[in-house]
Amino acid sequence: LTEQKKLFSTDRRDVHTLAEDINGADVFVGLIKGNVLTQDMLRSMNDNPIVFALANPVPEISYEDAMASRPDVLMSTGRSDYPNQINNVIGFPYIFRGALDVHARAINEEMKLAAVHAIADLAKQPVPDVVNDVYHVNDLTFGPKYFIPKPVDPRLITEVSAAIAKAAMDSGVARTPITDWEAYKQHLRQLLGQETKLTRKLHDTARLHPQRVVFAEGGNPTMLKAAVQAKTEGICQPILLGNPDRLKRVANRLKLDLEGIEIVDMRADNEQGRRATFAKHLAEKRAREGYTFEEAYDKMYERNYFGMSMVEQGDADAFITGLYTKYSNTIKVAKDVIGIREGYKTFGTMHILNTQKGIYYIADTLINRHPDQDVLTDIAKLSAGTVKFFNDEPVMAMLSYSNFGTDTAGSPVKVKNAVAEMQKEFPELAIDGEMQVNYALNKQLRDEKYPFSRLKGKDVNTLVFPNLSSANGAYKLLQALSPEAEIIGPIQMGLNKPIHFTDSESSVQDIVNITAVAVIDAYVEKIKNNK
């Protein structure tokens, strides 16, 4: 026997066959040939047996036969069409990656064990949406059918490689130590193209200034996962609205750890005092709009009224909502509780599209159905400020179906007038219109046909659409045609406080991204108020 095989040899004289040997065993690891393990053999094993049937393409016992023989078996094969595939790809590439990055002199046992622990720990963490999408499931969680990470899990490169590198350093075989682990993990994520500079910058900035963020639909699995992920990443201090017992049941089902996360039941008796305080403030604020204290108090049983009031009264810094409620209702609550910034008639939303051609800012994608000239002007002002908020310089095109007065009636006129108002108030701003979208995005075409434009020689990055249908349809069309494009939004602009929205289609990562925006928004708001 080779030295490796001698580790598994025995001097027992009472076993001569696999059936005798496996009786009462806890673990079976097979690397031999197909169909050598029978259902009777499997039934003879201890409770909750671990069976790794790794012969390929036919395992020692098929997955179907194993599961039919006993329900408590923890089963793995080497095949991708069954749960818990054991594949070299979840280990070897990242072991080599970590070893090479520290110029390790050897790959030792400490490093191998570090890989094992990193992979095992990863299986217990919430599963990224990208993994669920690949396998067409919604709720992969640690358990009998998922105790080994999937080979497509993008976190393997960061967690396993970093664990290997650290183990190499700790065991003395590394020649080039790593000092900044977060920078190292960012480098690894970039190798896979997992995150862009934009999202990385948002998350990094939010981590520097984490704020208290209220998540309205705490019992929604997607929002709950996002809140836990945001806390894990250090982006915010989550506050979940909802019934604590229900939230904990959902968290237990999803194997999510709620430790350190505040849960607020706005309908509970112990919140009577805050409901009264919030109602008094709302009734006084909207006294001339038909609000009585009793009506305002009743509204505080609703998550959006209560959650936004928490932000309004300083009990939280930002609010995320939208998965369950209609936008029209949420918009009304935001106007009632938070209010629109002084000097504006409305507020709006923007989506950021990070494409291969560059970053584009699109407005208004959610709020104003049929904006008039004044509302379009407000949207343009808010858009310019929001682009600057992201440390970019706005180059703005206000869009229509006509170009620079070719249609002197209908909606192009209000766009043209809004452009004139913006150019008068902000002569230094690069903004022009009305124009068709192809002229906005094709600098050469625009410069040749309309050389008088203020945008001559400039690449447009901000698109203001004439109404909600066109803006919303445009970003969703681009999203459908360019699935590789990263989209962040909707980003609220124009309310007095950081209130941000999601929709029923938002993924966990979408909500985490908008949470990072909300955190930065809240931090900037604090800086302004302290000046």
Regions found by a protein language model. Give the residues of each.
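Conserved acidic residues
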Residues: 26, 49, 73, 317, ...
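Adenosine-phosphate binding glycine-rich loop
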Residues: 53-161, 168, 504-506, 514, ...
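Rossmann-like NAD(P)-binding element
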Residues: 1-60
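Short acidic (Asp/Glu) and glycine-rich catalytic loops that position anionic groups and cofactors
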Residues: 25, 74, 91-99, 124, ...
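A short helix->loop->beta-strand "cap" motif at the edges of active sites that frequently abuts
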Residues: 46-50, 70-73, 497
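Anion-binding alpha/beta catalytic cores of soluble intermediary-metabolism enzymes, centered on
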Residues: 175-178, 184-457, 461-531
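Short beta-alpha connecting loops at secondary-structure transitions
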Residues: 3-14, 74-81, 96-105, 145-150, ...
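Aromatic-enriched
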Residues: 139-145, 156-195
